[in-house]
Regions:
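Beta-strand-turn-beta hairpins that frame and shape the catalytic cleft
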Residues: 40-53, 143-147, 151-157, 168-192, ...
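Metal-dependent phosphoester-hydrolase catalytic domains
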Residues: 2-39, 160, 176, 216-224, ...
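N-terminal, active-site-proximal structural segment of metallo-dependent hydrolase catalytic domains
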Residues: 1-125, 132, 137-143, 317-324
Length: 324
């Protein structure tokens, strides 16, 4: 298996601002990034349609294969998955948390009767190319979680970058799809749900700082961002305004979500988004929808997760076609 050691196909940029010393301990507790490419038949014709699934996998509890099967039953368009809270356990994760780094791990991670889905195993099972970068360790056990990109299409060089430290280590990951009409960048991110104890506990200022740095790192003209933005105060937050000012919108043409929540547990909030930046008119259309397991949106979870999956159905403009 490729990826148990640092892979040159992923460049990781460390955070050098406030809190960088504490981040050393978070880094010491996780395993190596994973990158591998499966052998797939070459795509005979230019890609005209693309499906992007963005989903918080609830640390491997989500039934990813079931959702992929549902999407595959509806379309044969290439699929790209932007997964937050992807779970991974392999020999690269330290068997024990480092002594001085023991606190730099996510807590509350009890064993489960049903095994969690390992993102590396899932990518192999689904026959998808993978770029995975861990953000944090899962408690005392030898596993971690992070952001992942899985793709039917070949992935160009991937990059990842640490966000400003607010509560926990967060590492978005991006990759480039080399398409006929030009490069399309896909990015998977997860902002902090809250801040440290005290006046900053709600995390609004922290998420704004993380969004600011995210936008500094994501510079492409054509970008699809799948993210758990954790906007506890909704689109009133400065983080949302920053994304809007950077030309990100909810689709092409942009349409604000009609659903009232994406986080399925209480309190039900809209935390998850697929946002598109299309400065060059490379995309003919991009429509975002929320997937529900139960038509009445009932049940304790949604396909095993506490978040709804979001799907973007993207139509690409043929190369050379002028905007109407």
């Amino acid at each position: 298996m490729v990826g148990v050691h640092a892979d040159p196909r992923i460049t990781i940029v460390p955070w050098h601002g406030d809190g960088q010393q504490r981040l050393h301990a978070w880094r010491a507790n996780v395993g190596e990034p994973v990158a591998f490419d499966v052998s797939r038949p070459p795509i005979a014709s230019p890609v005209r349609e693309l499906v992007v699934l963005s989903w918080n996998l609830w640390i491997g509890r989500a039934r990813l294969e079931q959702v992929v099967a549902r999407i595959r039953s509806q379309t044969d368009a290439p699929l790209v998955i932007l997964a937050q809270e992807a779970y991974r356990s392999d020999a690269s994760v330290p068997a024990r948390a480092a002594r001085r780094a023991g606190r730099r791990a996510a807590g509350g991670f009890p064993p489960r009767a049903r095994a969690r889905t390992d993102i590396v195993a899932a990518a192999h099972e689904l026959g998808l190319n993978l770029r995975y970068v861990p953000s944090m360790r899962n408690g005392a056990g030898a596993s971690d979680r992070g952001n992942a990109i899985l793709s039917d299409l070949p992935l160009g060089h991937a990059w990842a970058f640490e966000l400003p430290l607010v509560l926990q280590r967060r590492v978005p990951v991006g990759a480039t799809l080399l398409l006929e009409g030009g490069p399309l960048h896909v990015v998977c991110a997860h902002l902090d749900p809250r801040g440290p104890p005290g006046a900053a506990w709600l995390g609004v200022a922290g998420r704004a700082a993380q969004a600011t740095y995210l936008l500094e790192q994501v510079v492409g003209d054509t970008v699809i961002l799948g993210a758990d933005l954790n906007l506890g105060r909704g689109r009133r937050e400065r983080a949302w305004r920053l994304l809007h000012e950077a030309d990100f919108g909810a689709g092409v043409p942009p349409v604000l979500p009609s659903w009232r929540h994406t986080f399925h547990a209480l309190p039900r909030l809209v935390l998850d988004y697929v946002l598109v930046r299309d400065r060059l008119g490379q995309l003919a259309a991009a429509r975002i929808e929320r997937l529900d397991e139960d038509p009445r949106d009932r049940g304790a979870t949604v396909f095993g997760s506490d978040h709804h999956p979001l799907v973007a159905r993207v139509r690409l403009r043929p190369a050379g076609q002028e905007l109407s």
